[in-house]
Curated annotation (Swiss-Prot):
Pfam families: Pribosyltran. CDD domains: PRTases_typeI. Its EC number is 2.4.2.9. One of its GO terms (biological process) is DNA-templated transcription termination. This is Bifunctional protein PyrR 1. It catalyses: UMP + diphosphate = 5-phospho-alpha-D-ribose 1-diphosphate + uracil. The gene is pyrR1. Keywords: Glycosyltransferase, RNA-binding, Transcription, Transcription regulation, Transcription termination, Transferase. A motif (PRPP-binding) lies at residues 99-111. Substrate binds at residues 39-40, 103-111, 136, 160. It comes from Lactiplantibacillus plantarum (strain ATCC BAA-793 / NCIMB 8826 / WCFS1).
Amino acid sequence: MAREVVDAMTMRRALTRITYEIIEQNKGVGNLVFIGIKTRGIFLAQRLAQRLKQLEGVDVPVGSLDITLYRDDHHAVDVAGQAKLNGADIPVDINGKHVILVDDVLFTGRTVRAALDALMDHGRPAKISLAVLVDRGHRELPIRPDFIGKNIPTALDEQVSVALEEHDGHDGISIEKLEE
């Protein structure tokens, strides 16, 4: 049975705090691009951009990445042996920009590694930062987020689920013990 660990109001506050941290750590926000990792990372990137516009009056472009074909547990290649680029919607040239990758949960780091590979196929940003709503620990790769909504330590036999209004009909974060 899942137990809610973050409600909608706490989630909103965490996203607002991330937005303030992004503003504070950047000399202006005109060079930023948010890129959400499919699926919930896209909605979170859009929310961060909306909040940033409310606070700073600046429209920050928002793009999306589907990293399915870049995962190290997926082996789809075309006839030439090249990984197929799939599902990226990046509305601006990212060369020389500060890209902030956005995802819902950081766990092993493998999704972020795949996103970095996919992103580099689209250009060469001046800087890449990582914003996550939840950092649950248990990294398998040396990846550390720059902006964290909530640190939620978990056991390996637990699953963190993020619900977003745009996708799930409500906001919240819950933890559930996996079946053995």
